[in-house]
Amino acid sequence: MVRMNEVFDCADPDQRARGIASAVAALKGGRLVVMPTDTVYGIGADAFDRAAVAALLSAKGRGRDMPVGVLVGSWHTIEGLVYTMPDGARELIRAFWPGALSLVVVHAPSLNWDLGDAHGTVMLRMPLHSVAIELLCEVGPMAVSSANVSGQPAAVDVDGARGQLGELVGVYLDAGPSAQQAASTIVDLTEATPRILRAGPVSVARIAEVLGVVPASLIA
């Protein structure tokens, strides 16, 4: 039985194991979890639980017009989530995953999820954080957004997340301060030409080099 608002110190092996198990139970029960990632802390739900994703948006005070992204625990997971692998996707995944790069792609039409008004697209990322990967490998793809109330700073530690989200979250996994302390770079691969929608830790120059394009062509 998962008690509400549990916090687990993942620096302690026993607490980490119990925390992962509690987070898995919470997610399977339709509850929300705060988890560490390499960029900022995230608030997450089972990506295929529509009610839980709606609760996530509500906890953040966010509308359907700002859909939730999805974190995955392995490279191959993306194959089952996309309609087709767009040009450049494999190159970017090989270069930057796991890491601070999110890719917007057209999702497979058969997927039974509702992440908000995403118009057939989904933002995917594989985080560079062992706790996040362990959880994702246990539960599968998770709908995850930054662990903050909309309009407030993204939390870079568990105390910042708890201060904003409190009892709305069932389990908090504490792994200390985020390494990057900045939201991921976002690249849109849904059109013929890749575009950077948000600057972040992965630079325009590095992305352009991998794609073999001029950096200026990536600026939205």
UniProtKB/Swiss-Prot annotation:
Its EC number is 2.7.7.87. PROSITE patterns: YRDC. It catalyses: L-threonine + hydrogencarbonate + ATP = L-threonylcarbamoyladenylate + diphosphate + H2O. The keyword Nucleus does not apply. Residues 17-202 form the YrdC-like domain. Gene3D superfamilies: DHBP synthase. It is an enzyme of class 2 (transferase). It is found in: Cytoplasm. InterPro entries: DHBP_synth_RibB-like_a/b_dom (IPR017945), Sua5-like_dom (IPR006070), TC-AMP_synthase_SUA5 (IPR050156). Pfam families: Sua5_yciO_yrdC. GO terms for molecular function: ATP binding; double-stranded RNA binding; L-threonylcarbamoyladenylate synthase; tRNA binding. GO terms for cellular component: cytoplasm. Keywords: ATP-binding, Cytoplasm, Nucleotide-binding, Nucleotidyltransferase, Transferase, tRNA processing. GO terms for biological process: regulation of translational fidelity; tRNA processing. Required for the formation of a threonylcarbamoyl group on adenosine at position 37 (t(6)A37) in tRNAs that read codons beginning with adenine. Catalyzes the conversion of L-threonine, HCO(3)(-)/CO(2) and ATP to give threonylcarbamoyl-AMP (TC-AMP) as the acyladenylate intermediate, with the release of diphosphate. Belongs to the SUA5 family. PANTHER family: SUA5, THREONYLCARBAMOYL-AMP SYNTHASE. This is Putative threonylcarbamoyl-AMP synthase. It comes from Mycobacterium leprae (strain TN). The lineage of its organism: Bacteria, Bacillati, Actinomycetota, Actinomycetes, Mycobacteriales.
